[in-house]
Amino acid sequence: MTSAETASRAAESGGTPVRPCSRPHRAPSPAAPSRPGAPAAGPRKLLVPGLPCLVRGGWPWTRPDSSPFRPAARPRMSPHRSPAVARRCGRPRRRDPRRRRTPALPRPWPGRGGPGRSLLHRHLFIQQLLRTCWPALPRDRTPAPGGTMPGAALAGPGRQASGSPAPQSEGAPPRPWTPLQPGLHHRPPSSSSGLLSSFF
């Protein structure tokens, strides 16, 4: 069948003549999906913001009221930053200049998976020491079960023990020893100020 016969048959049927294809063509592929909010590809009509406009697929699409200033802006890398991929032929990758260097020694820092967190919270640690009267209470000077210092009764009425809590009058019974002595080194913390008052 020649092209003239095809055209005559199409004219008899009332349609438009179809050109015979010499080689098969690929069907027109649909447009690539764009980013959400980007202007649609194709003829735009009725570009009033908020109204539907006709795009290539025929679907109504509402144009956003405000579009970003640089819609396709990509993050730029400065020329000083090499990518973190090790492309340097076996040599170590370049250090990120924004990352601070950790000192070389001492390597095991006191708190990298070591003892508990009491040494990290240093003020809490000091408060614990102050509450237990650590500097003023050596090992041999533990309170007696009766509640008195052991050295005060043994020293006699005239002599004071070297670590007795307070000077007493002669012949008076020894005062009960309390672990927190406010006059020596401890003051009860005041919550009015933000400072740690247990230090002073």
UniProtKB/Swiss-Prot annotation:
Compositional bias per record (Basic residues), positions renumbered to this chain: 88-102
**Region (Disordered) residue spans:** 1-116, 137-200
Write out the biased-composition intervals (Low complexity): 1-13, 28-44, 189-200
Annotated protein name in UniProt:
Putative uncharacterized protein WWC2-AS2
Species in which this protein is naturally found: Homo sapiens
- Its gene? WWC2-AS2
